[in-house]
Amino acid sequence: MRKQTDLAKVKQTALALLSTEINETPYSPMIVKHPFTDTGVSAIPDGKGGVEMIDLTEDDAQLRWRQSMARQIDKADSAYAIYMMVIKPYALTFLKFAMPHLSREDMSQILASAWTRSEAPHQDVNVTVNQLLRMFKPADPTCLMEQGEYIQFKTLDDTVTVYRGVTPHNAKSVKTLSWSLNQETAEWFVHRFGENGTVYEAQIDKKHIYAYFSGRNESEVIVDPSYLTNITEVQDLSSDFLLSQE
């Protein structure tokens, strides 16, 4: 990994993503899909100190928006500043392509933010589980985690019991990176949309755990799923869980 970030190369990466097609949806122009915007109604400087609202489904407006975004990217003074221009669903995609040009510190900080900003990062169709592992394994844990998280991470036992809740929607995503130290958290994921699913318990050696995140009260650990052992279904506690919410 690079000792220093090559900011010029990171900007080139961002500009390449900026040049990709804006994909319309049934709700366009209000909702579109693109690494730098999720709405087709955007504001750009009008050259008079104000802003102008434009429709990105129109070719001329789209060109002007791309030019405006390119100027912002060019003015950015850090890789993190560029990363923050990318919308959440594409955060890990940006990191995947920018990673060869990032220092270990910058990569770790962006990875931590991208992971915790995303609703279901391990289900990102643009980034595979193996690619995510190639991000987490070389990351600097002191940059990846907050101080309190790092302290908790260091105190984990040599072998750790972890839990994961899945629903019919993600029933095949058992051996994946994201697990919890807390069974109640896994239960919450099973029932949060009124669904019934399954909670799994497994063991994993600490050396195959790469991060601990306490945000959103999830007690989340990032693991190499190939080293999970003794994966078993936990006794169905759904009725007890639902009663506890009344």
List each language-model region with its residue ranges.
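Conserved NAD+-utilizing ADP-ribose enzyme module
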Residues: 1-162, 167-177, 183-246
